[in-house]
Amino acid sequence: MIWAALTVTFYSITAYGDKYISAKLTCTPEEYTFFVSLVTVFWLALCLPFTGWRLGMDRYCIFFLVCLVVWKVLEFYTTAILLRHMEPYELKAWLGINMILSYGINLWEGKSSFRVSILILALCLLTGIWLILTDKKRASGGMGKYIAVCLLYIVSKFMYGLQMGKMARYGNSVSILILVLLIVALIQLPRLPRRKLPAGKEMTGVILSRLTNAAGLMTEAEAAASNIFFYTLIQPLQLFVLFVACLITGRPMSRKKRAGSILCVAAVLLSSMALL
């Protein structure tokens, strides 16, 4: 359980670090993608003496690497855009849809049986997301464009996870991540706007947020190896922790948004436990 608890802690800190980079430093999607990728590579490289470098190359591996780069760029861009207008827990609530999608794929492949309870919880999750979306403070602006970016975020996360699983036969996760994120960072170089880049305390915040991300990647692997039950609960527990943190810090929240948020958190937690 300790590994899962550490992972939730590290990833929750990272989520606020992402919010800091995107909203506080007002980084463009290109800047956000570059900083997040490059600094994460730095911390992951320090882990190589413990994990080793293992990555076999053939044409299928190269194809999957290209796909991972595409999905990771899309994930970072959408994250940078969304975190300017939403709290970190809201972003995690959207990821609950991926859990339902995974369940649907397992149904299609005959790996799971149909459960009415999961369908009800999926409807609760979608209802909660809709309540948050239609909150009066978010009503102004292009709702359609906002939803489109959220859906792109979900697709990028889902496809990245799916193809990362297929890459496991070619090497360890640290080696794959270093190569993918390094390519992502290099792609952003020509696209970086010409302005003064973060430095001093601002850059320290960026570096520390990636340290917790790298640490979370390590403890997540340990959690998966030690206890699959607690590993499965990492995502819903992180959503719960981020929501509680939002309440404790007194972030403005209407009754409608609060109700939708509680519905999302409950639906994701119960769905995770039901699918074990």
Predicted regions and their residues:
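Structural signature of hydrophobic alpha-helical transmembrane segments
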Residues: M1-Y11, G56-W71, K111-T127, L151, ...
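Membrane-interface helix termini and inter-helical loops of multi-pass transporters
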Residues: L48-Y60, L107-V116, R138, G161-S175, ...
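Hydrophobic transmembrane alpha-helices of multi-pass small-molecule transport proteins
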Residues: V41-L44, I97, L101-L107, V116-D135, ...
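C-terminal ends of transmembrane helices
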Residues: T14-L25, V73-E90, I129-S140, I187-P198, ...
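Structural motif at transmembrane-helix junctions in multi-pass transporters
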Residues: K24-E31, Y77-W94, K111-S113, A168-S175, ...
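Loop-to-transmembrane-helix transition segments
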Residues: M1-T7, F35, A45-L48, R54-T78, ...
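Glycine-/small-residue-enriched transmembrane alpha-helix faces in small-molecule transporters
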Residues: M1-E30, I120-L121, T127, A139-V174, ...
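Alpha-helical transmembrane segments of compact multi-pass small-molecule transporters, enriched
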Residues: V39-W43, W94-E109, I183-I187, A215-T219, ...
